[in-house]
Amino acid sequence: MEYVTLNNGIKMPKLGYGVYQTPPEDTKRCVLDAIEVGYRSIDTAQAYGNEEGVGQALAECGLPREEFFLTTKVWITNAGYEKAKASIEDSMQKLGTDYLDLLLIHQPFGDYYGTYRAMEEFYEAGKIRAIGVSSFGPDRYLDIEHFANIKPAINQVETHVFQQQKVAKEY
């Protein structure tokens, strides 16, 4: 497995298994299959509605939690300090873990400043190993970077032939 080292020294696998659009009733089986063929980085999100299936797979796979790099994202309906804190605790409960390897703000909408403050607190408490953002354009990324006490470790951006993200790449 190849890794990238984040800005805080945490090593993240370059290849991960994402469960976007995986129906909740299929998530456990799909993640168990992914683990069986060697995936150790699992990417989910509150908005996907399948965190519980990921947690069930991790609990049933027979491997220790430390073998995995687990990522989830705070959805825009949970933006703001208090709502984000509650949603992070809820995500950890659904995932069956007492820590996350990476937590991202899913999109730059709502009070993402409050969301990021909540994430920083979890990071400082040792409940999150790395924090960052997702789908932030260069302007929003610079904004949060200047606001943050803890710089984002990553800006996860969807990239494919139909969405090439040329501006984000140039930045």
Task: State the predicted function of each range.
Residues 20-22, 45-47, 73-77, 105-108, ...:
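Active-site beta-loop-alpha junctions enriched in small/polar residues
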Residues 107-171:
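Beta/alpha (TIM)-barrel catalytic core signal, keyed to glycine-rich beta->alpha loops juxtaposed to Asp/Glu
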